[in-house]
């Protein structure tokens, strides 16, 4: 009996977004944990300028506070012809490079998590992990995510939306109160996010947010705990919600919130997994996370972030491809229900293949 060949998995990482380095860190962890008996890994990097290039498995972690970055080698291109799906061409050398069976797009932020690269994969006919074009695009835009969730009857955090470098008027300020959080509408990893405790600091916060996006959200601070729930789709289409994780705080965050350095550099974030919530509330949050996943039409995976107080809760964000670094919440909350990192990846890849 002939042994089955390992599935060839292209792990695509880097990209043009401000979350380039986070993507590299996630990809390094993913490649390290893929079962070599089941999967043959083909690393593909995307430079900050957007060139697809030969990747590598080493050097994708933080060293002495320095963030990893994709270096340009030979340029690569994915075939867009479904008849030759999975074929990758070496543009620099004008020759065939390799073929792959499935793609894991470990791309956070614009040009990766927003439906653009998913459209490329749809054109090529290649199976890929994660949400499709529409769910990725909606999930990337926090304004439209909330509009969709509200239409489905799900509770969301209030917000004001600004575009074109506009600022808040007095009525909006009165509605929001202080403090507020200012964030790019289509960003992640807390990049470009500021906490504003005095209105005279608003313009500086808006300037920072507008550097990342031409649409900005202003949200009031909501008293209560930050609670995160992961959702995993299995090959048969069934959905599993993780236990909730409660963010306990950061040890060194000068910004006063769960910021980029706390998430990826300082390792200053601690979490209670499972969150110390009642059985009833835990079950309700897990169900709401699944409902949010379905409302977006997501696939494969998501992480749903809640604000939870003593008497109520609301959804803050839905992330259609959450961070996969070794200290990211998504792998941790599933480890707490017995789904280890390697099994998590195996499930995601098999789900992508079953969907194709």
UniProtKB/Swiss-Prot annotation:
**Its annotated pathway?**
Cell wall biogenesis; peptidoglycan biosynthesis
Might you report a single GO cellular component term? cytosol
Q: Which GO terms describe its biological process?
A: cell wall organization; peptidoglycan biosynthetic process; regulation of cell shape
Annotated positions binding ATP: 173-228
Binding annotation for Mg(2+) 1: 305, 317
Q: What is its EC number?
A: 6.3.2.4
Protein location: Cytoplasm
Keyword list, A-Z = ATP-binding, Cell shape, Cell wall biogenesis/degradation, Cytoplasm, Ligase, Magnesium, Manganese, Metal-binding, Nucleotide-binding, Peptidoglycan synthesis
Catalytic activity, reaction form: 2 D-alanine + ATP = D-alanyl-D-alanine + ADP + phosphate + H(+)
A Gene Ontology molecular function term of the record: D-alanine-D-alanine ligase activity
Name residues in a coiled coil: none
Please name the Pfam families in this protein's record: Dala_Dala_lig_C (PF07478), Dala_Dala_lig_N (PF01820)
Q: What cofactor(s) does the depicted protein rely on? A: Mg(2+); Mn(2+)
Q: Decide whether keyword Lipoprotein is in the record.
A: no
Quote the InterPro entries the UniProt record gives: ATP-grasp (IPR011761), ATP_grasp_subdomain_1 (IPR013815), D-Ala_lig_Van_CS (IPR000291), D_ala_D_ala (IPR005905), Dala_Dala_lig_C (IPR011095), Dala_Dala_lig_N (IPR011127), PreATP-grasp_dom_sf (IPR016185)
As for family, the record states:
Belongs to the D-alanine--D-alanine ligase family.
**Record protein name field:** D-alanine--D-alanine ligase
Organism, scientific name: Corynebacterium aurimucosum (strain ATCC 700975 / DSM 44827 / CIP 107346 / CN-1) (Corynebacterium nigricans)
Q: What is the lineage of its organism?
A: Bacteria, Bacillati, Actinomycetota, Actinomycetes, Mycobacteriales
Gene behind this protein: ddl
